[in-house]
Amino acid sequence: MTNILLINGPNLNLLGKREPSIYGDKDLEQIEQELIEKASKLNCNLECFQSNSESEIVDLIQQKSQSTDVIIINPGGYTHTSIAIRDAFLAVEVPFIEIHISNIFAREEFRKESYFSDIAVGVISGFGFEGYNLALDAAINLCSKK
């Protein structure tokens, strides 16, 4: 069975409440439940995790590196700041997909730089919640090629 880890970074626990004009009206629990059901139908195990703490995200990437086939991450605000999370990905060498609900390149100037895009397998940005489905499909396809 394919094991996929979904990590959501800071403030994504506020989905549905935080700036719905940018991030939509679904909450994180709804998104995760839909993805878990989809993954199960495709014979995959999807584990979901959200944290506002950079160190917890780094710890999780390290801890799950041996049991995870691919990681999907929405790093939230850490996209533009976290060398520590970037270094964790480089250290464990687990393929990962970077995802953003909004198009980070169509927003404020400081949001246009990602510390992850150049080391990610791929980046999905600007498709709203559908981006999570696209990332899950891409992760499953990536694993089937191994």
Residue ranges and their predicted role:
Residues 91-107:
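Short, acidic/small-residue loops that bind anionic groups at enzyme active sites
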Residues 45-55:
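Short beta->alpha junction loops
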Residues 15-29:
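Glycine- and acidic-residue-enriched helix-capping/strand-helix junction motifs
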Residues 10-12, 76-79, 102-104:
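Short glycine-rich anion-binding loops that position phosphate/pyrophosphate groups of nucleotides
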Residues 63, 82-91:
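Short Gly/Thr/Asp-enriched flexible loops that form oxyanion-binding sites at enzyme active sites
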Residues 64-71:
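Short acidic/histidine-rich motifs immediately flanking catalytic phosphotransfer sites
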Residues 47-48, 106-146:
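Short, glycine-/small-residue-rich phosphate/pyrophosphate-handling segment
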Residues 1-4:
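Extreme N-terminal starter segment of soluble prokaryotic enzymes
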